[in-house]
A protein has these predicted regions:
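Predominantly a Rossmann-like dinucleotide-binding segment in NAD(P)-dependent oxidoreductases
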Residues: 121-208, 341
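Beta-strand-loop-alpha-helix segment that lines the small-molecule cofactor/substrate pocket
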Residues: 64-71, 75-122, 137
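Contiguous beta-strand/loop segments that form the cofactor/metal-binding neighborhood of enzyme cores
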Residues: 183-263, 301-313
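C-terminal helix-rich "cap/oligomerization" subdomain common to oxidoreductases
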Residues: 64-67, 102, 113, 221, ...
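N-terminal Rossmann-like dinucleotide-binding module
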Residues: 1-45
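Conserved SAM-binding strand-loop segment of SAM-dependent methyltransferases
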Residues: 47-53
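Hydrophobic residues in well-ordered beta-strands that form the structural core
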Residues: 51, 90-91, 115-117, 228, ...
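C-terminal glycine/acidic-rich active-site capping loop/insertion
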Residues: 220, 243-322, 343-347
Length: 347
């Protein structure tokens, strides 16, 4: 399947690496309003470059696009792609409000095209094992389900682009931008959220409109309770791993980035031996805790391969727009709660 990239910034480069490495896809073209940026990325991968989106989408060989523009600028290029008859994979968040996401979903349905998201933290062996355990009910009655994203961003990060730290284009701060993948993982594992209560604050950065620290209490539909803590002002030399922790009456599993800190179940299975020997080796450095460029592209690769396979098989991908909508719904509810003095908001 021939891919086109919309947005030749940092994320566009990750997309290009993933597309080049994947099975079932090749990079056909790159679009960016900045012709120089489009030329540079396209030249590196032997693709065509465009600075006119209509000309980019008019390419008959182009079948699917990835969208890596700023978060609050996903709507227009994705709508254009869907209406031009292209499938679309959109970076996180799918969009920054539920009405915008619903508009995209309607356009995909009307044009008979697949709309999917980049939910790349779902695609590694640790998450595969975690999801299997959750689906098999190995935790018993789930009591606790929490996510902790204690990351750090220098002031220079926010100053590097005018859209960073704005409601209009970033959609939020530490929670919406840095933490959405981990929030998605929490919902993916623990199930639907019933209500949230939250507080947010900007503690350590200037010239931003949004939060750099957030704490939310979460109530799940299954009765479990938990916490989401998201920050870009918690420094550590090597960076704190993003953590997802589930615990219930029959078991507990604590995941730190891609490795387990705890994997303990009342009823052990043969697979637990392998999981403990291969997936409990300490957290892998360089997953974006301190440096947003220090992430690998392999999870993006698996994400893209899953979407292509779903299209070829005539099914919805596991990272469908419906799935991507869930984390944005929870995050926007958290913001609503924080803006109303911690009022309980039902999702």
């Amino acid at each position: 399947m021939k891919f086109g990239i919309i947005g030749a910034g940092m994320i566009g480069h990750f997309h290009a690496k993933a597309i080049t490495a994947m099975t079932g896809g090749t990079l056909h073209s790159v679009f960016d309003l900045r012709q120089e940026a489009a030329d540079k990325l396209a030249h590196e991968y032997g693709a065509k470059a465009f600075s006119n989106i209509a000309e980019f989408l008019a390419e008959s060989e182009l079948e699917i696009v990835t969208v890596g523009t700023p978060s609050g600028a996903h709507l227009d290029p994705t709508l254009a792609a869907l209406k031009a008859g292209k499938h679309a994979i959109v970076e996180k968040p799918l969009e920054i409000t539920i009405p915008r996401i619903d508009e995209l979903m309607s356009a995909a349905e009307e044009n008979g095209k697949t709309l999917a998201a980049v939910l790349n933290r779902r695609f590694h062996p640790g998450m595969d094992a975690f999801k299997k355990a959750a689906d098999e009910g190995r935790f018993g009655t789930l009591a606790s389900a929490s996510a902790y994203i204690k990351w750090y961003r220098e002031q220079a990060y926010y100053d590097s682009a005018g859209w960073r730290g704005t409601w209009a284009l970033d959609g939020g701060g530490a929670l919406m931008n840095q933490s959405i993948h981990t929030v998605d993982a929490l919902i993916y594992l623990a199930g639907p959220v019933k209500s949230v209560q939250a507080t947010t604050v900007c503690l350590a950065h200037e010239r931003i409109e949004v939060e750099d620290h957030c704490v939310a209490i979460i109530e799940f539909e299954n009765g479990a309770r938990g916490v989401i803590e998201a920050s870009t002002c918690t420094w550590s030399k090597d960076g704190h791993p993003a953590r997802v922790q589930l615990a219930g009456t029959d078991g507990s599993a604590f995941l730190a980035d891609e490795a387990f800190e705890i994997w303990d179940f009342r009823e052990e299975k043969p697979e637990d031996i392998e999981i403990k020997s291969t997936l409990m080796k300490g957290q892998e450095a360089g997953l974006g805790a301190n440096d947003p460029t220090a992430i690998n592209f392999h999870q993006h690769q698996r994400n893209f391969e899953e979407v292509v396979a779903a299209i070829n098989e005539g099914r919805q991908p596991s990272t469908s727009a419906t799935e991507a909508r869930k984390s944005v719904e929870v995050i926007t509810a958290i913001y609503e709660s924080a803006q109303n003095n911690g009022k309980k908001i039902f999702v």
